[in-house]
């Protein structure tokens, strides 16, 4: 995993405010990485980072647009899952709402399953996200252990 990470950020509606506060508090770090997000969350995160980068333009901050997928219920979670399986996501920050059933719960479960399957560092709440972003691995090199799936892919049916 290179120093510049591809970070997926997702938040259910009741968690968007908390995610935006996290982004605001950590925009100086996050602006150095490539962000990918589901639709609505991506728009809000992009706006937040753009405002902060504009405020600090004289300090050499550069704005990188957020790569926005579809909204979660419209397939965005599955798009992120596909990116994880293709090796295109390094970190997943997903503030999900444990108190609110979602119409796309199966998609959420699939996304989280793929993050575990491919050993992607994942934060599902603010505390874990703060631990992740403060790790020396977040901005440094990190060799993620990859699982060998050959016994599964080469099994005889």
Swiss-Prot record:
SMART domains referenced in this protein's UniProt entry, alphabetically: MGS
MGS-like domain span: 1-157
Entries under InterPro entries matching the protein: Methylgl_synth, Methylglyoxal_synth_AS, MGS-like_dom, MGS-like_dom_sf
Catalysed reactions, semicolon-separated: dihydroxyacetone phosphate = methylglyoxal + phosphate
GO BP annotation list: methylglyoxal biosynthetic process
The entry's keywords: Lyase
Gene Ontology MF terms: methylglyoxal synthase activity
EC number(s) on file: 4.2.3.3
One of the record's GO cellular component terms: cytosol
Residues that bind substrate: 12, 16, 38-41, 71-72, 104
Annotated catalytic residues: 77
Pfam family, one: MGS
Family as reported in the entry's similarity comment: Belongs to the methylglyoxal synthase family.
NCBIfam families: MGSA, PRK05234.1
Physiological role: Catalyzes the formation of methylglyoxal from dihydroxyacetone phosphate.
Protein name: Methylglyoxal synthase
Organism: Maridesulfovibrio salexigens (strain ATCC 14822 / DSM 2638 / NCIMB 8403 / VKM B-1763) (Desulfovibrio salexigens)
């Amino acid at each position: 995993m290179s120093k510049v990470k591809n970070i997926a950020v997702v938040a259910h509606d009741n968690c968007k405010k908390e995610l935006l506060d996290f982004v605001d508090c950590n925009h100086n770090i996050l602006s150095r990485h490539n962000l990918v997000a589901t639709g609505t969350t991506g728009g809000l995160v992009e706006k937040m980072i753009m405002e902060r980068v504009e405020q600090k333009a004289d300090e050499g901050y550069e704005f990188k647009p957020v790569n926005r997928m579809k909204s979660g219920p419209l397939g965005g979670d599955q798009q992120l899952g596909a990116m994880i399986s293709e090796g295109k996501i390094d970190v997943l920050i997903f503030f999900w709402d444990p108190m609110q059933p979602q119409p796309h719960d199966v998609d959420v479960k699939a996304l989280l399953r793929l993050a575990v399957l491919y050993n992607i560092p994942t934060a599902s709440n603010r505390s874990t996200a703060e631990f992740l972003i403060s790790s020396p691995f977040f901005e440094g090199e990190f060799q993620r252990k990859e699982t060998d799936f050959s016994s599964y892919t080469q099994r005889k049916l």
